[in-house]
Amino acid sequence: MTKDNKTFEDRLDRLKAIVSALEKGDLPLEEGVALFKEGQTLSKECATQLEKARNEVKIVTGGEVEDFDVDTEEDTADDS
């Protein structure tokens, strides 16, 4: 975890809540600006965490990072 003990998922959940609140459009200006700033910070922190994870995967895989397929329920249903 990071120094403030928030996980990537914690940050992402908060970012989703901020986006939802901003999309409603009924916030006072000051609150909207504060949430926007918080969202920008969270977005940068998430991007940093993702890049760090990607680099760790590169190290583990010897520099090879490939996209992978995630089976969804629809995909597995089509395969049967």
From Swiss-Prot:
Q: Which Pfam families match?
A: Exonuc_VII_S (PF02609)
Q: What is its EC number?
A: 3.1.11.6
InterPro entries found in the cross-reference section: Exonuc_VII_S, Exonuc_VII_ssu_sf
What keywords is this UniProt entry annotated with? Answer: Cytoplasm, Exonuclease, Hydrolase, Nuclease
The reply on keyword Hydrolase is yes
GO terms of biological process kind: DNA catabolic process
Could you tell me what reaction this enzyme catalyses? Exonucleolytic cleavage in either 5'- to 3'- or 3'- to 5'-direction to yield nucleoside 5'-phosphates
* Compartment(s) of residence: Cytoplasm
- Could you give a GO molecular-function term held by this entry? exodeoxyribonuclease VII activity
Gene Ontology CC annotations of this record? cytosol; exodeoxyribonuclease VII complex
Q: Which SUPFAM superfamilies does this chain map to?
A: XseB-like
Question: Assembly and partners?
Answer: Heterooligomer composed of large and small subunits.
Protein role:
Bidirectionally degrades single-stranded DNA into large acid-insoluble oligonucleotides, which are then degraded further into small acid-soluble oligonucleotides.
Q: Which family does it belong to?
A: Belongs to the XseB family.
* Designated name of the protein: Exodeoxyribonuclease 7 small subunit
- Organism equals Maridesulfovibrio salexigens (strain ATCC 14822 / DSM 2638 / NCIMB 8403 / VKM B-1763)
Q: What is the lineage of its organism?
A: Bacteria, Pseudomonadati, Thermodesulfobacteriota, Desulfovibrionia, Desulfovibrionales
